């Protein structure tokens, strides 16, 4: 588990857009995509589990992101694969809003942190 890192500020990511936080900045094994959609910030491993594509470059709608290569969809809330060709989900990461700052907790699953487990 890594320490939280400042990745931006509220308003830096437009609605249904994402930014990529490079693994070199987080110490985590994959780049992490931070999404803003439906009024919430969410983070997932950036690499699609089906092919080596950046999910941050995909199409974001509501609580889903669609891979730009083969149209696999993933839940922004749980990381679950929602349709083929992906059958394996991606990891979630906690994003915390502190004032107007966005803090990413690499390696801390979002649902676990939200549930307090």
Language-model region placement:
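N-terminal pre-ligand scaffold of iron-sulfur
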Residues: 1-62, 76, 92-117
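Short cysteine clusters
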Residues: 48, 67-70
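Short cysteine/histidine-rich metal-coordination sites, predominantly Zn2+-binding motifs
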Residues: 62-68, 81-90
